[in-house]
Amino acid sequence: MTHAAYPAEVPERGYRYLGDEVRRGKQFPRAEVEAAIARYFELAKHGTTTGDWNPWADLFTDDAIYVEHSFGVLHGREAIRQWVTTVTHSVPSDLDIVGQWYLIENDVCAVYTPNRRPAPDGGEPYQFIGFSVFIYAGDGMWCYEEDLTNTGEIQRVNAAHADAARPAGNQQ
């Protein structure tokens, strides 16, 4: 099954780990991988604040695989670019995607990622959690990403944020 707006495949029998299909099998210095993680989140911030996700998409190799359990499996940088510009509508937002902590085992990274939106009243932010697995390809690029999120949590948090952002007396 595929989605009409972007080239993602949704496996009928469920997801399986696809990282080994693109893994390079090379050793990388930890500092290089950490710098690539920092750059990834820097460009994600650029994407959310400007609506321009092209620099972020350019972090992926031509043969990258991106598994987004809510949307499907994407093959290649251009499919990833088409997906992210479709789902974000290339519109700036107040979403802050933060790599709070990570584990690195050579080229494989596991990252705990709160996705935060500021509270309209200035209080605690609204957030939903993501957990991602990345495979580093070298030269600052990624050949694999798999995002795990709870779509129910995303919908609940976004609805609560939208309700809080409406002017008092206009809660429809």
Enumerate the language-model features and the residues they cover:
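Hydrophobic pocket/interface hotspot
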Residues: 40, 52-57, 64, 76, ...
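Short, cysteine-centered beta-strand-loop-beta hairpins and adjacent loop/turn segments enriched
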Residues: 89-93, 116-127
